[in-house]
Amino acid sequence: MPDQKDRILHFKSPLGDKRCAISALSGYERLNALYSFDITLLTELDPIAPQELLGEDVTVTITVADVERKLHGVVCEFDEVDPVGDNVFEYRAVVVPRLWLLGLNSHNRLFEGKDAVEIVKQVVKDSCGLAIETSNLKSYRRREICCQFGETDLEFVLRLLAEEGIAFYFKHTKSDCKLVLSGGMSGFENCDPVTYPYNERDSSAWKHRVSRFKRAGRLCSGKLVSTDYSEYAPASPLKVEAKSKASKKLRPGELAFHGGHDFELKGDRNLPNGDCKEQAKRWQHGLEADGAQYTGDSGAPSFTAGHKYELEDIPVSSGGEKQFLLTEVTHSATEGYDQESYYGNSFRCVACSDSMTFTPAPPRERPRVWGPQTAKVVEVKNPEISGAHAEVKVQFPWDEEHNSCWSRVAQLYAGNEWGGFFVPDIDQEVLVEYINGDPDRPVVVGAVYNEKNKIPPYTKWQSGIRTRSGDYNELRFDDNPGSEEVYFEAGKDHNFLVKNDEAGEIVRDQTLKVGADQKVDVGSNIEYESGQKINVKAGTEIVMEAGMSITLKVG
């Protein structure tokens, strides 16, 4: 193969410098997205097996007029192409960031007491080891619980960043690639060099210049309405709005979001309206990110998505703006083995503004869990101590390391200090549903028996309720034909209160057995009437006492 030393495209890999060389490159990089580059490799005599490069870290160097641009990544695809000549083999390799590997992992798990940035760092570290830098980030709310369910690690990370309005891009240094999380315009780095001339008439492809620069625009939604609800402030459902400052003609339409907020625990758990308003603003900025842009062409390989540059000889189409943030760059290069070498790119950018935050578009869909799941109760909140709702923590079989957040328990009905109240106990198996399918908002809707927790010793005709304590209380119904029965048992005491009258009818016999004393305290009269006889028997004595008189009448 030709020596790579004096070429505009250089390929560094575990194969060494002389095994193969690049003949062409094309690819793109975007702000808030993963980059991807297709490279064409040529080798002589010694074919390359896919396993030699798949999963390997490689570096592509683009050199134009003594300015180098590094592209680091991992090979995710490798295809053999038809030979281009005698003993010359051609291959196609796709190079992506190591963050791409997160798309190969999928987990069902819970994160407790962490903010979005902490979660992202942990997932990236565990999955691919890509270095992360943060720039101009603020503090983010700690989430009581954050659930990853049915998502790849990559989908999960991108969702968290979008929910918090955190922009990201990749920074390629001489030795490696880093993921940069940015919280505002000052969090984006400059291109190197930072200043580029504008000249449409110069046909040289090797100058670091902008050869085309035009305005571009898109219609986008001009208003975002976000609603939500928290059981800790049921009388004040959340509704926040964010509007564009542009004209309604350019920003028609309105997008409605519901249930997209993760409320932070703050004392009484009131809704953090200020935080939600800021989140709505960030989401609106994300919707407007593509509204007013510029497109162009250049011969500068140092143009990198997520980086800023300054334009000299400002064209009329710039509207007087001088500094711009690159949001998308598409690269193209060919190596001059049998043709003239070439490098060029096309790009999209926005004018830099301190008031602008180029955030990701809000996630249109959170992951959904449709249908119930089983879980085991691991903690029960005592309402006598906390004054809280009927709440439990559960552990899911797909995450034995963490417990869920405090989850409400659905009742038959619930009012203000009235309604049903049954709370499952520790080690019970329960069924969990999710409000609007959101895995971060579980609700316990029932309990089921299993091999460990067996049903009460009832027959097929019997049903009822048996509670758990040192002993138990029970209300049982027996529907065996001819032997129907309602059975009540108190584990210790039985107390009841009738605030007016009590009436009843016993068609046949009544038997009452009292193991110790019986006392009846009546505020007025007692009347007994028997159709035949009344027997009174005492083991030792009978004492009858009247304040005035005793009357005994016979016949």
Label each region the model flagged.
Residues 26-38, 272-290, 398-411:
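Short, basic/aromatic beta-hairpin or loop at an interaction surface
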Residues 84, 114-132, 138, 146-353:
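Extended, domain-scale alpha-helical bundle/helix-rich regions
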